Amino acid sequence: KEEPLTTHADHFNTNYAYSVASYSKGEVFLAQLGYIVGQKTLDNILLDYYNQWRFKHPNANDFIRIAEKRSGMALQWYKEYWVYSTKTIDYGIGDINDAGGKAAVTLSRIGLMPMPLDVQVTYKDGTSEMYYIPVNMMYGNKQPENNLPFIIKSEWKWVNPDYTLQISRGVADIKQIEIDPSQRMADVNRVNN
């Protein structure tokens, strides 16, 4: 069973929980931060962090401060959820309805950890669009990471388990909808993405 990263090394209940906390979750933290802020921004965060703190003794807040400054986003919420809790990330696509010639897609937060979402919509004509839904705790948006049209939607308030995504075209035009096509978000059940 997973335990919070803040558990002292000598106090983990199992070696497995210690291994996950000590090795895997740190790697996933950085990869997923790239999903939140964008990979180019993450690369710059890591360079800034190295340049400012090499041969010194930083703490976790020093890293988050640099990440917030470089990204222009509030990221303390991300650190708090990832380090101090064992809440999981799980998002799913629910109903897809036609609303006046435009598709209305119900997205659900099944897990208890909120995250911003990249939702790629592929149409039957072969074109695609990337819809970006920030979390209201971020106070900012990432920049587009590919050449797809990048549409920033209204923020998803973390207290709401569901969100209705309005898509610019009708249901009949849609071939596929996918949450996190880059697969950098640590979603525990990608089947419903």
Residue ranges and their predicted role:
Residues 46-53, 164-167, 188:
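Compositionally biased, low-hydrophobicity segments enriched in charged and small polar residues
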Residues 181-192:
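Short acidic/polar inter-strand loop motif in beta-rich domains
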Residues 1-106, 110, 114:
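Hydrophobic alpha-helical and helix-loop surface patches within well-folded domains
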Residues 89, 95-163, 168-181:
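Beta-strand-rich binding/interaction modules
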